[in-house]
Amino acid sequence: MAKEAVKYVWEGAIPLQIHLHKSDVASHPAPPPALVLAPRIGYLPLLIPLIKPYFKDSLPPGEDSIWFDYKGFPLKWYIPTGVLFDLLCAEPERPWNLTIHFRGYPCNILIPCEGEDSVKWNFVNSLKEAQYIINGNCKNVMNMSQSDQEDLWTSVMNGDLDAYTRLSPKLKMGTVEDEFSRKTSLSSPQSQQVVPETEVAGQVKTARIPVRLYVRSLNKDFENLEDVPEIDTWDDISYLNRPVEFLKEEGKCFTLRDAIKSLLPEFMGDRAQTSGEERSIDDTEEADGSREMGEIKLVRIQGIEMKLEIPFSWVVNNLMNPEFYLHISVLVKAPQR
């Protein structure tokens, strides 16, 4: 199952329907939208070499400053495409209709992007951050040869899991172990990576997990995901770049619930409202306390709506992104004030 999960992550793709913004159309009639499969672990700027030739005959002359939006909402290029989709489409939209712009870069909202070079820099920088969180330093990334670093990046760009699995053990990022993972191991490529015996001794059983948490908070409750309103501004999304301390207790499985509770304690207190717990309808005080605490409505990782009882070790070892960060998208009902 673990091998299938990692393969799912690497082969996962989102069908995109890319529309050229009307202000960039210099031909008549306007070109039809481009249809592209976007890798979940990839980034939107990496699609430009596929998309730009399609629209080239319709573009006005001049220098390009390419960016994407969803229903007028500028998309941050350094967030993986799959995370953007999970975060912005509560009810999955297929194909996902995006608009591409070749002018008018919104520098007040998006940091500049110089194409693949910027995306690669972001990836390597994230890799260094992850290793610092896990190992307390980033020397293995820094000491990686230039050719290995290039090959690692190429494996991510091309979605080549086999090449990535050969190269990533050199980073010695370690794996997460608890009683659950020891019993069910060891089918994950990231827990079965072939490492020379001289390197095994240096492998770390990490207790700190790099996590990027994206929290979208709604003031009004909803019954169905299609009722979730559109996002107007990035201010509606809280972003936490924070490690999870993986606590190992004998006889206890550290779950996704435990991890999220460490990140969002205001939504995961003893009286917080979560699914699967029995409550007395007559207990008004308990119900009021639940509303005051707010409610986690949805947790998504790699497009999967996660049950909070799943062992966190499985989630980390199988659903993390190639830069060794676990990206978690959360939809919450805000506490009543």
Curated annotation (Swiss-Prot):
There is a cross-link at residue 128 (Glycyl lysine isopeptide (Lys-Gly) (interchain with G-Cter in ATG12)). InterPro entries: Atg5, ATG5_HBR, Atg5_HR, ATG5_UblA, Atg5_UblA_dom_sf, ATG5_UblB. Disruption phenotype: Mutant plants are hypersensitive to nitrogen or carbon starvation. Early senescence phenotype. Hyper accumulation of salicylic acid (SA). Increased number of peroxisomes and accumulation of peroxisomal proteins. It comes from the Eukaryota. Its main location: cytoplasm. Keywords: Autophagy, Cytoplasm, Isopeptide bond, Plant defense, Protein transport, Stress response, Transport, Ubl conjugation. Required for autophagy. Conjugation to ATG12 is essential for plant nutrient recycling. Involved in a negative feedback loop that modulates NPR1-dependent salicylic acid (SA) signaling and limits senescence and immunity-related programmed cell death (PCD) in plants. Involved in complete proteolysis of chloroplast stroma proteins in senescent leaves. Involved in the degradation of damaged peroxisomes. This is Autophagy protein 5. It comes from Arabidopsis thaliana (Mouse-ear cress). The gene is ATG5.
